[in-house]
Amino acid sequence: MAGEDHPWQGSILYNLLMSAKQKHASQEEREVRLGAQCWGCACGAQPVLGGERLSGGQARSLLYRCCFCGENHPRQGGILYSMLTNARQPSVATQAPRARFGAPCWGCACGSAEPLVGREGLPAGQAPSLLYRCCFCGEEHPRQGSILYSLLTSAQQTHVSREAPEAHRRGEWWQLSYCTQSVGGPEGLQSTQAMAFLYRSYVCGEEQPQQISVASGTPVSADQTPATPQEQPRAPWWDASPGVQRLITLKDPQVVCEAASAGLLKTLRFVKYLPCFQILPLDQQLVLVRSCWAPLLMLELAQDHLHFEMMEIPETNTTQEMLTTRRQETEGPEPAEPQATEQPQMVSAEAGHLLPAAAVQAIKSFFFKCWSLNIDTKEYAYLKGTVLFNPDLPGLQCVKYIEGLQWRTQQILTEHIRMMQREYQIRSAELNSALFLLRFINSDVVTELFFRPIIGAVSMDDMMLEMLCAKL
């Protein structure tokens, strides 16, 4: 075009000039690229002939000018092309796997479009290509049916990624039912160990044992090591075995029982002389009182600020008792001191009213909650009315009347709170939380703690009937 001399394509001088141009490429052209290597255009698909010559004596060029990037690329099927494509596969850019969806690309349908030919070979002397360009990821994959494809697919099945077990653990919640059946039988773990086992395997994310020995009832695993005594979990709060519960009794039962009896009398006097309660029949009064006397008494004792202390009775030493009995048989009975005779009687009397520490702690927690709220006298009275008039009790015949009494009591309590408190909604929520704690107090525990040393074997239902009929 310009009348200048240029080297022939395919000559040594042409290759040197083109390689120099590739090294001294401008930075602007590199920035314009999309960040990925160019794989050439369709011009490189022309086959390279062996030792044959083209017409005119020109040698076939191993490189061609790409229509996309303007650079020279090796022609497909040549030795240089095979070497470059094999070198590109191990040095894949690190950004490509991040763009994937967390799983390797398995190729597209182009891999099965051109079947591999056996020993006959392709027409026109072309060698079959073992790789193809994927339409999804842009990388080259082995064609289906080749030896390379079989090797890669078998390797992908065996070498599963390490992220798979972590994602699969979320779907293994159904294994809890199987674990429960395995450890729940008589040959399985104990109740506490089973719950701890399920907690560690599911919540904490530890490895679950693969096998369970039927003879020993303990989990067996290859990675499991014998647990040290320090690693054994402590007994949880839900364990109701007798060895876990602490049994306690009143430290001063006479004073506490007298104060509780006085509180019960004031409670029944308050209930009995309510005008809306007096018009009810006696059987309906009994239904209300027999079901609500314990919560009403707790409110009364909290209003009176009853403080009581508990203590644990130490276990008797069997060996010491045997030695004492043997000494009395050989040496004769010794004159016992007054203090020595009174102490065993007090311990034996107290030992008959031992209660679980958790049940007594529920009563103390309710007292502390009421004392922290500084409930006044009217609030205590309205709370007692809310507890007394419970329309959900079985055996009530005048349900609508009791419902109206409870609703009216709650309305009066709300009006009182609005008048006395600026933030009445918070105060109402605090009082409701105190009433909620009454659900955890058992009436049998209240009877054994405060009244069993006084009434003996008499039931509290008979006591309620007698107190309602008597003049208080």
Curated annotation (Swiss-Prot):
What does it do? Nuclear receptor that lacks a DNA-binding domain and acts as a corepressor that inhibits the transcriptional activity of other nuclear receptors through heterodimeric interactions. Component of a cascade required for the development of the hypothalamic-pituitary-adrenal-gonadal axis. May also have a role in the development of the embryo and in the maintenance of embryonic stem cell pluripotency.
Name the UniProt record assigns to this protein: Nuclear receptor subfamily 0 group B member 1
**Molecular-function annotations in GO:** DNA hairpin binding; nuclear receptor binding; protein domain specific binding; protein homodimerization activity; RNA binding; transcription corepressor activity; transcription factor binding
The entry assigns this protein to a family as follows:
Belongs to the nuclear hormone receptor family. NR0 subfamily.
The UniProt annotation puts motif AF-2 motif at: 463-468
Q: How does it assemble?
A: Homodimer. Interacts with NR5A1, NR5A2, NR0B2 and with COPS2. Interacts with ESRRB; represses ESRRB activity at the GATA6 promoter.
- One Pfam annotation reads Hormone_recep
Q: Name one GO cellular component term.
A: membrane
